[in-house]
Amino acid sequence: MNIGRRDLICGLGGLAVGGAMLGLGSVEARAAGQAQPASGRFDQVGGAFGWKPHKLDPKECAQVAYDGYWYKGFGCGFGAFYSIVGLMGEKYGAPYNQFPFAMLEANKGGISDWGTICGALYGAAATFSLFWGRKEVHPMVNELFRWYEVTKLPIFNPGDAAQGVKGDLPMSASDSVLCHISVSKWCYENKIEATSKQRSERCGRLTADAAFKAAEIINTKIDQGKDFKSTFPMQASVSSCGECHMTKGNDANWAKGIMDCTPCHSGTAATQNKFVNHP
């Protein structure tokens, strides 16, 4: 069969248009597929805890977390989370680099300045649950949070790269995972205003410290698997108070939580009734 030049050109043009339409159709199909649940309500693509964890250099994570803290003012939760998942995205691509990282900005100031959980701790702990379920994450969070309660921080020092205040900062153990207590105690003991650059710098460095520790925990978890255990014992106050207040069947079993009891219930000057005869 003889094919003329005109027929050949028309045929190629038709193939090109057809191929483009097929490509458009596949893009639309993918978009439609992404808009739908994996198989039904509450399911997700890849399954729960379906992402693969990768080892990271804790020192690199710390620096990225510190820089992330200052990035657009997104703060501690963003910096800590990005230092793990964002770095995996930079090194390994999808799905890590597809996460909407800016949503972690909500954790700034203990979640929109409410002073609840330290945003750096939340950002770091949230990364664990991308890879492992509750039972496996529990000892990982215990390790991170109990470390934070008892360790004198900040350890990280950015040197001349400091974005708030250069030089050493006072170090202390917060005894609490709550932003309100951690910040207030440090500011009170060191006579530093909570709205100061020094306080912001401390939080930036704490973000780096939390990221460093979280990366260490993830690396160890990858090596040890289900054998991973927290190296920190239960706090003495939780063990003692829990005998009554966290024991099933006890009339006083109305307390929930395993954070250190003493910062809120020790009866110190800071925990007395401040609404009576307050100046």
From Swiss-Prot:
Q: Where does heme c 2 bind?
A: H180, C261, C264, H265
What SUPFAM superfamilies does this protein's entry cite?
Answer: Multiheme cytochromes
Instruction: Extract the InterPro entries matched here.
Output: CGCAxxGCC_motif (IPR010181), Multihaem_cyt_sf (IPR036280), TAT_signal (IPR006311)
User: What's one GO BP annotation on this UniProt entry?
Assistant: anaerobic respiration
Mind telling me which NCBIfam families this protein's record contains? SptSoretCytCDesul (NF047622)
- Function of the protein: Diheme cytochrome c which may be involved in sulfate reduction.
> What name goes with this protein?
Split-Soret cytochrome c
The organism is Desulfovibrio desulfuricans (strain ATCC 27774 / DSM 6949 / MB)
